[in-house]
């Protein structure tokens, strides 16, 4: 962590189609090499595919998926007297959101469909129904925290 000043939070604008800040953050996370228009077409294409397959509001599916992926607790390493303990700590809301977005994108990129639009659509639908590898990642994180509950008194 920096000893100097903390980085300022940047102001981001809501996305043009839905007017949602989280969708903009999601697009920025999907974006590679600064190609925002490509990221935009991937996200909106996936939302259209979700609308077609699930017959539900895509924004609702997206938010449900993020809620199902976001972890409540995680483990952090803490060194005490020569031993390193995995200490379970609560996750701050901003980090919860960031982890959910990151895990969703990673899981979508690992899927086997041909286009990123299809992969993202599949992962969004799976995550909104509490399935898929992004939800499994959250479950594994919670299991780790539960297994190390004995060290929770080392919190800082």
Swiss-Prot record:
GO MF assignments: rRNA binding; structural constituent of ribosome; tRNA binding
PROSITE patterns noted in UniProt: RIBOSOMAL_S7 (PS00052)
Entries under Pfam families matching the protein: Ribosomal_S7
One term under GO cellular component: small ribosomal subunit
GO biological process, one term: translation
Keyword Lipoprotein: no
Keyword tags: Ribonucleoprotein, Ribosomal protein, RNA-binding, rRNA-binding, tRNA-binding
PANTHER family per record: RIBOSOMAL PROTEIN S7
Function summary: One of the primary rRNA binding proteins, it binds directly to 16S rRNA where it nucleates assembly of the head domain of the 30S subunit. Is located at the subunit interface close to the decoding center, probably blocks exit of the E-site tRNA.
Family named by the database record: Belongs to the universal ribosomal protein uS7 family.
Assembly and oligomerization: Part of the 30S ribosomal subunit. Contacts proteins S9 and S11.
Protein name as catalogued: Small ribosomal subunit protein uS7
Organism: Rhizobium rhizogenes (strain K84 / ATCC BAA-868)
Organism ancestry: Bacteria, Pseudomonadati, Pseudomonadota, Alphaproteobacteria, Hyphomicrobiales
Protein encoded by which gene: rpsG
């Amino acid at each position: 962590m920096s000893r100097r000043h903390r980085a300022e939070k940047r102001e981001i604008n809501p996305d043009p189609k839905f007017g949602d800040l989280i969708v903009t953050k999601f697009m920025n996370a999907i974006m590679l090499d600064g190609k925002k228009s490509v990221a935009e077409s991937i996200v909106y294409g996936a939302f259209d595919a979700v609308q077609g397959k699930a017959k539900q509001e895509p924004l609702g599916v997206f938010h449900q998926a993020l809620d199902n992926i976001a972890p409540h607790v995680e483990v952090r390493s803490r060194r005490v007297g020569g031993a390193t303990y995995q200490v379970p700590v609560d996750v701050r809301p901003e980090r919860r959101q960031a982890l959910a977005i990151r895990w969703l994108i990673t899981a979508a990129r690992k899927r086997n469909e041909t286009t990123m639009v299809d992969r993202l659509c599949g992962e969004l639908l799976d995550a909104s129904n509490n399935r898929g590898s992004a939800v499994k990642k959250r479950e594994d994180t919670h299991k780790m925290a539960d297994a190390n509950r004995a060290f929770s008194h080392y919190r800082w």
